[in-house]
Structure formats: C-alpha cells, structure tokens
Amino acid sequence: MGSRSRILLIGATGYIGRHVAKASLDLGHPTFLLVRESTASSNSEKAQLLESFKASGANIVHGSIDDHASLVEAVKNVDVVISTVGSLQIESQVNIIKAIKEVGTVKRFFPSEFGNDVDNVHAVEPAKSVFEVKAKVRRAIEAEGIPYTYVSSNCFAGYFLRSLAQAGLTAPPRDKVVILGDGNARVVFVKEEDIGTFTIKAVDDPRTLNKTLYLRLPANTLSLNELVALWEKKIDKTLEKAYVPEEEVLKLIADTPFPANISIAISHSIFVKGDQTNFEIGPAGVEASQLYPDVKYTTVDEYLSNFV
C-alpha cells in the first residue's frame, strides 16, 4: 500500500467522531477536521478536544455541512470523507454528497452510520423513520456513483454494555435487570475506540469498497441472557430478572411521547427483533474481525471486568 489517504472528518467532536478522529491520527493519516469557527473559538469541551487533535497533527478546517462553498473547499484537499454527524444532521448529508460530486476526486465516502444495518431492520415507528433517513442517504450516494463504505458497528459499549441495556444507568445493575423480549436475540457490543480503529482500517482497503463493513465481533456477540449470566458470574450474585414481552414493549413505545420513544423503538429492533444478527452477511458485506485479525478489540468480558 502506498501513502495513506488524506481524510476529512465531519463531526469530529461528536460522540463517535472523536474516536474516529483519534484513530485516523494514530494510524498515520493526514487528518482534516471540518468544524464551525464558533466551536473552535469557544471555551467548550469540544474546543479543548480540537486543541488536543491539533497537537496530535490534525488540520482544523473552518466550515459547516450547511455551507456549500466551505464543504467544497474542504473536500478538494482530501481523498476520503468520513461523516459522523448526529441524528439531527443525517438528512443534511445530501450537502456532502453534492460537494463530493462537484469536486469529483474523492475515492471514498463513509456516511454517518455506526449502528444497525439500516437495510436489514424490522423497526417500528419512530425508529423506522430514523433508519429510513439513513437508508435514503445510502440510495443518494449510490445514485451519484460515489464510492462508499457503510460501517455497521451495532451497539456502542458506552451506551448499551456498561448499563446492560438498562435505561438511565451508567454502570451494570447489581440487583435487578429488565430484559426486553425473551432475552435470546443475539446482539453485538463494540467499544467506541474499536469502532474508530476498524473504520480507519477500512479507508484504504479495496475489500471494503462499495461494501457494508459489519462489526460482528465473535467475542462480543451474545444475547442479553448470556450477558446477564456473565455479569452475575463476575459479581457472584444472581440478579432479579423482569422480562417484558413484545406486546408490552410495543405498548410502551405507543404510550411514550416523542422523542423519548425513539430509544425504546431502537431497543425493540435490537433486543426483541434481533436486527443486528438475524441475517447472514451477504456478498455486499464484509466482517471487520475477519478482515483485520490484527486488531485486538476489547471483549465484552474484558469491558465488564472494569465494573466489578
């Protein structure tokens, strides 16, 4: 492989973007971060984060996803564009697509995905619409003939694993656990740093071109029942388990006001329907741990040991 691709990251100060930015720098890519001037000049945590990225060699480019001229200028200087924008800006990624199309030299675009594979979900509203917006962005990329990689990284460990998927908790429960469905759907939990690493590994890899990169890591793919049993073994205690049948989950989604019901509907897709693992990875997909066996990812077992 020749020189490493120059990467433009849009959304570098966000929840997952910061890990992708760090991985890009750590793996030696010339890294450009598109940020609003107001973010860079503030005294916020995000501004401090940008300073640390600058110290590690990142190039800060002022601009915005809503400013076409600044997007075009930023895209001109790179080979690969990675978007990690948040849910409110998913639809605005059509602006990135326009800029990439206009410049015409980008070798790969990674739109903001980093969750379930939106082409393989059985979600109910309002999650259904959330996934459909991401799918719409995919179709726009394909229609313009822009080379792409979609990263399906499944569950963020920091959201779902550290709490054993319990709403409102920041550490695994030690008394009672609520399990949606029968607890047998297999789910994939991935540490955010590892999502960053696998994403950047894919940037210059021809095997991931015009494919979905699935992070279906064998040591991190387990059911909620298996996860709870693993935790119980670690703390040498049996938790009280409350199972919520699907009908009750659907009623809860219907009775909970928007937007609070989005997270419940996403959990229904993951933990009841099993949408992260209920399909085979076909020819349009590749699996990260098979492509990059050298990446020593944090296992679920190791992750939970930090909370004992």
Swiss-Prot record:
SUPFAM superfamilies: NAD(P)-binding Rossmann-fold domains. GO terms for molecular function: oxidoreductase activity, acting on NAD(P)H, oxygen as acceptor. The keyword NADP applies. InterPro entries: NAD(P)-bd_dom_sf, NmrA-like, NmrA-type/Isoflavone_red_sf, PCBER-like. Signal peptide: none annotated. It is an enzyme of class 1 (oxidoreductase). One of its GO terms (biological process) is lignan biosynthetic process. It catalyses: (-)-dehydrodiconiferyl alcohol + NADPH + H(+) = (S)-isodihydrodehydrodiconiferyl alcohol + NADP(+); (+)-dehydrodiconiferyl alcohol + NADPH + H(+) = (R)-isodihydrodehydrodiconiferyl alcohol + NADP(+); (2R,3S)-dihydrodehydrodiconiferyl alcohol + NADPH + H(+) = (S)-tetrahydrodehydrodiconiferyl alcohol + NADP(+); (2S,3R)-dihydrodehydrodiconiferyl alcohol + NADPH + H(+) = (R)-tetrahydrodehydrodiconiferyl alcohol + NADP(+). Pfam families: NmrA. NADP(+) binds at residues 11-17, 36, 46, 138. The active site is at 134 (proton acceptor). Keywords: NADP, Oxidoreductase. It comes from the Eukaryota. Its EC number is 1.23.1.-. Belongs to the NmrA-type oxidoreductase family. Isoflavone reductase subfamily. Oxidoreductase involved in lignan biosynthesis. Catalyzes the NADPH-dependent reduction of phenylcoumaran benzylic ethers. Converts dehydrodiconiferyl alcohol (DDC) to isodihydrodehydrodiconiferyl alcohol (IDDDC), and dihydrodehydrodiconiferyl alcohol (DDDC) to tetrahydrodehydrodiconiferyl alcohol (TDDC). This is Phenylcoumaran benzylic ether reductase PT1. It comes from Pinus taeda. The lineage of its organism: Eukaryota, Viridiplantae, Streptophyta, Embryophyta, Tracheophyta. The gene is PCBER.
